[in-house]
Amino acid sequence: MKTLRATIKGVGHYLPERVIENAEFEKTLDTTDDWIKSRSGIERRHFAAEGELTSHLAVKAAQNALTDAGLTIDQIDAIILATSTPDQTFPATATKVQAALGMQRGFAFDVQAVCAGFVFALANANAMILSGQARRVIVIGAETFSRIMDWTDRSTCVLFGDGAGAVVLEATETDGASSDRGILSTDLHSDGRFSDLLYVDGGVSSTQTAGVLKMEGREVFKHAVIKLAQTADAAMEKAGVTADQVDWVVPHQANLRIIKSTAQKMGVPIERVVLTVQDHGNTSAASIPLALSVGKARGQIKRGDLLVAEAIGGGLAWGAVVLRW
């Protein structure tokens, strides 16, 4: 008996042209390149140009993913966009992406789970494919976090960047074995008791302003390592695989120390972790699809590889996906 799986058909990304090296922050903040690198592993990040919106980044990443998949937009049933930095309060930025891509069928909507957004969006797309709601789905993570930074706060503004990544998921019949391609499991969590650890101090119904990012870095670090390892372990158990079988861990690229500590807790050597944080900074929901696309382009991620993607973000919200590339 055949089993339906949501398989990765294509992947792509887009990074804004403007690159900000750590040294630039030395001009306006009490910080140094060494200080930033030692605490985060970040060396540079990309910032969107004036007038360059989240939807613009998302469209370019989606186009690259479609090209990689060998598909046209007319063959897509749905678009799910993970973002915390939408173009407008409404409509959903995904519908602007839908229009820009020339898609006149199906449906498009946004998912907001901050840095965990892409994992949540991927789980949504997987469920829609398995239920027959859609056959092919573009899942995008796109962010312009440079628009919500407090440029006087050296503990946060040096950490984030802008960018977008996308994958095309396609329904595929398989034998249902863990060796078959596709999403093998998902694991999602949130706990609103910790919402004050990472948030933006603005909103439509509260302040009528966009606000700026606020973070209790040390507390987030402690929660991140424990929760990321736990959700990765839970997803692997659901998939019937073990850490020693994993070819690549593709983590949310927030902080190199978090990434290393989580990998150690999972029992995965850092050599089997896809790292892009040094070049991108924390791109929130865009970080995992960016890492998937860059990892493939580098020749790290190959067809048949077993991957674990895990992320945590404001909410707190966290989760993991196990998939066979």
Residue ranges and their predicted role:
Residues 1-50, 153-222, 226, 230, ...:
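Condensing-enzyme catalytic core mediating Claisen C-C bond formation in acyl metabolism
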Residues 8-10, 36, 65, 76-79, ...:
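Buried hydrophobic positions in well-ordered alpha/beta secondary-structure cores of metabolic enzymes
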Residues 13-14, 82-88, 113-118, 141-146, ...:
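Acidic, glycine-rich active-site loops and adjacent beta-strand->loop/helix elements
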Residues 30, 61-77, 176, 230-247, ...:
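Phosphate/pyrophosphate-binding loops at sites that engage ATP/ADP/AMP, CoA/4′-phosphopantetheine
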Residues 37-56, 83-137, 264-292:
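Conserved catalytic cysteine-centered active-site region
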Residues 130-163:
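Flexible, glycine-rich active-site loops centered on histidine and acidic residues
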Residues 220, 224-230, 243-266:
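Active-site pocket-lining segment
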Residues 290-310, 318-325:
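Catalytic phosphate/nucleotide-handling subdomain of diverse soluble enzymes
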